Structures are given as C-alpha cells and as structure tokens.
Amino acid sequence: MLSYISAAFQSPSPDEGVQQRPPRYVGEDTTPTSRREILGWYSYGIAAEVFAVCGVGSFLPLTLEQLARERGTLQTSRLPCVGPSAGNSTNATEHGQCVVPVFGLEINTASFAMYTFSLAVLIQALTLISFSALADYENNRKTLLMVFGFAGALASMLFVFIAPPLFVIGSILVVVGVTCLGSSFVVLNSYLPVLVANDPSLQEGKADDGTEMSSFDRDEGDSEGNPWGKDHTDNDSLDGLQPSDQPQSSLEGGMGTKAPLSSSPELQLSTKISSRGIGLGYCAAVFVQIISIIMLLTLSKTKLAKVSATLPMRFVLLLVGIWWGAFTLVTRNLLKTRPGPRLDTVSTKGTGRWRAWLRLVGFAWKSLWETVKVVSKLREVLIFLVAWFLLSDAMATVSGTAILFARTELKLSTPLIGLLSITATLSGMTGAFLWPQVSRYFRLQPSHTIILCIALFEMIPLYGLLAYIPFIKNWGVFGLQQPWEIFPLAIVHGVVSGGLASYCRSFFGLLIPPGSEAAFYALYAATDKGSSFIGPAIVGGIVDATGQIRSGFFFMAILIVLPIPLVWMVNADKGRREGLAMAETLGKSHGGPAEDAQEAEGLLARE
C-alpha cells in the first residue's frame, strides 16, 4: 500500500508525455493513461465518499436538526426544547412538537432538516443539468472538479463555527455541500471515458493471453505488493442480469452488427476501474466513520458536549471536511487536466466567453429536452423511467427519514447512529455482490430481480407501521418501538439499495438505443436527482402536520410499492428491439454513423 501512496509524490514518467494516437481536436492530450492518473481518480472517490456516508448519510441531518432544536420551543407549552426548563417527557405529544421559527413560519425541527435536504437535492439537479456540457471543454473538467471538491470540503469544515443561533446558515452550508458532492462525482465520472480511451492496452492491442490489461494492471503485474490482489470480478455489470441459460444475444434483437455491450474491452476496463473506485471509497468511509464514533465518545465526556450537543458532531464534520480537502489535493497533483476542445474558436475573452458558457448551459437543457422527446417514442424506456422516478424518490426518502427517526423517535445516541450508518454501508457493499449471485441461482429475469428488491424494501415502512396496531403497541416491542430494531432494517436497507442501484442502471442500459448512451444516461441521472427532492418534502409536511415522523411511513409504503407494476410491464426484449430501431432512425436522420466524431457525453451521462 505504501507504494501506492508514494505515487502521489513521484515525478511523472517521461513516457507519460508521449502522444500515442492522433488527436481528435486541437490541444487534445492523448498521452497514455498512467498509474498516477488512475490513483488520482481513485483518490477523489476516497475523498468525497467520506462526506457522502459520514456527512450526508449520518451527521449532517442530525447536526441540522439538533441546531434547530436548541433554538426551538415546544408548540403547546412554549418551553425550550433543550435546556433545564424543557419538558422531561420524551413523548412529543405531551408538550407538543418541537418547532422553530424560520422566515415567519413555525416548522418542526425534523421537518426543517428534511426541507433543507430536499432543497439541496433540487439545486443539485439543476446544477448537474446546467453544467452538463461545460465540463467537456478546455480545462473545465479538472477546474470544476477542484472547485466543487474544495468548496464542498470548506462547507463541511465551516460547520464547526455554526452555533444554534446560526442554524439557518447551517442549512445553506448543507445545500452547498450536497450540491458540490453530487456535481463533483459526476465530473469525476466524466474523466473515466477519457482515461479508458487513452489506456495503453486499448491502443497497443491485447496481451499475450488475449485479454485486455489496463496500465494500472500492467504496473501491478504479479507483484505480491498488490494491495487489492487479483480482480476476479471484471465482468460487466450486465452479467447476472439474465439467467445463465439465456444467451446475452437474446437482448440484441438479432442485429449482430455490434458486439454485446459486456464484451466491449472499453466497457470491461471502465467497469473494473469504476468498481475498484467505489470499493475504495466505501472502505475509506467506513474507516472515517469508525474514527468519528471514537471522537464522539471521547468528546461527549468533555465540557464541549455541555456547551452544545452539536459541538461533537460539528468537530466530526470538521474532520470530514479536512479529509475531503486533503484527498482532493492529492487528486489535483495526480490527475492530468486532459483538456477538451476550445470553448469558442472566435472569441474566448471578455463577454464572448460568458456568452459561450451561457450557450452551453442552454445546449445542455435543450439536449435533455431532445432526449425526452425521443424517449416519448420508446414505450419500454418511458415506463422504466417513470418507475425509476418513483423508486429513486422512495430510496432518498427512506434514507433521509431513517436517520431522523432514529434520533428523534428512538432516541439513539450519535455514536449509535454512526454505527447504524456503518451497518447500512457494509450491507450495501454486500448487496452489490450478492444480488447477481441470487439472480443466477434462481434464474431470475432482470425485472424480477428488481421487483424482489422493491418487495424487500417495502418491509421497512410496513414494519414501522406495525406500531399502530394496538396489541403490538402495548407490547412495547416490534414495529420500531425499541432502538435495536432499526439495525436489522438497516441491513435490509443496505442490501436492497446496493442491488437496486446496480440493477436498475444496468437494466436501463439494455433499453438504450446504441450510440445514444450519453444522452439517455443524462436523462437517467436527471430523473434520479429531479425526483429525490419530492418525497422528503412531502414527509416533512406530514411531520409538520402530525408532529411524528412515524406517520410518514404511510406515504413511504405507498411510494415504494408504486414502481412494482411499472417494472413488471417493461419487456426487455421488446425494449431492446425498439432501441435498435430508434438507433437506425436516428442514424439516418443525422446522415449516418459518425464513428470518428467526438462524443459529446456531458456530465450527467457518467453518473
């Protein structure tokens, strides 16, 4: 492992400056992808995934809710929610819900956190779409990655200064952090096609055994110092989507003009790099989460916790921000700029440059709309996107609600919530590897596997609703009445989420017209981000009306089950045939294929 860390401080190899293929545009960097670059790409995943898991998934919603709670009052008695004069009862119905004034309105403190994250996701979606074309030009790709990375890290670090009277500013920092997180990941993924395209193995041919080897694998060789060992999971993510006795070509519509997606050397290499990056990011997140729990346990015994219950969590967010910024700096040193074509060949200075940027923003939205018009003619794709719209909203709603429910209803301590996050994260990693095996063993169709995941996901809100049954409520256990009950549900949530994330994306890929992957994945990502703000906002409104988060489980139970009939209706074979026919139509309308043309993928296509 030390050999990999030391790469950050080594000088680039002289061979890295040698152009290996003719450039497609003036200024294109076609030098071979080096081990340093791959490590730089991994490094940012290690940096930002920590904020995604430890910040967004754990301590940010808790900190925001607690900051508001320390400024809030009980709605009925008007006693402070926190302090010596606060009510001793933990039952919110006895003294009324804890509310805080925000812009003249009284909002439940848990709803305040949910509204904030809902707004953050909405702004993130608008940002992703607007910047989708800009990053493909000049040095914008690396510039945007650094801007988003350092700005997000700074937003996390600044939480250490956010005292309860400044809780509204804390919500602004959440919006900035979440927006930078999502945007930076998409920019990072936009590097992947460039790194793969310039990999020496794809330019020089195949290895002696006929298999593709990336430059990173060449550097590793058979050395015993390889910290990740041999990679036996190089198959594309489409593997396991079909029963073992069903040929992959059955989804190709019999065209036979192109190799199956999973046999593409570029896609195999891209999948290998991506899967390793995700794994390293999750490992880093678990590592920092463990450190965070130790910090919380230590700081809770000091005078800091007596000043404000948020201080230990704010110091954890400081640590998370420092980690994010430090590894972003490593990425800055290792990752090449890899510039795109010039933004404006006529005028690149002054107002002309700004006009060019605005045109690209407009182009991004226009491209998205053009894709929507094409999708409207593809019935199977349209049905699946509607299902994905509902499903992604349900996943975001359950994730955001669970943390606040654990804190406000189950009274879980902050370290235990950190442990809850670790449980869900490790379960998600397990689920990503488990579901392909389950699918092969039971010979499940892709849609059946997705439906099975959704059915298991439905267990979470249904289990929480058991507490409304009188005799179960009298037992005082089951139906999420005891803190320990949420941990088995966290395992279910993690395993199901890991399967849904990978299977839905791969299944959608089977329906895409060949040659339009970038545009359709842009719409897929926009559908994800564009829907994920609705559910949390609705649950926030329900909590405001009822004073209890548990009442939001009714809405979540309905939201989760809605995609099932839609997924069942999708015919993958028919969708693939429609996609191939549409690809032929689009090819004719654009004057035939243009294999040598530059692919304008856009940011959203790589998420």
From Swiss-Prot:
GO terms for biological process: amino acid transmembrane export from vacuole; autophagy. InterPro entries: Atg22 (IPR044738), Atg22-like (IPR024671), ATG22/LtaA_families (IPR050495), MFS_trans_sf (IPR036259). Glycans are attached at residues 88, 91, 235. The keyword Membrane applies. It is found in: Vacuole membrane. The chain crosses the membrane at residues 44-64, 111-131, 143-160, 161-178, 277-297, 310-330, 381-401, 415-435, 450-470, 484-504, 521-543, 552-572. CDD domains: MFS_Atg22_like. It is a multi-pass membrane protein. Belongs to the ATG22 family. This is Autophagy-related protein 22-2. It comes from Penicillium rubens (strain ATCC 28089 / DSM 1075 / NRRL 1951 / Wisconsin 54-1255).
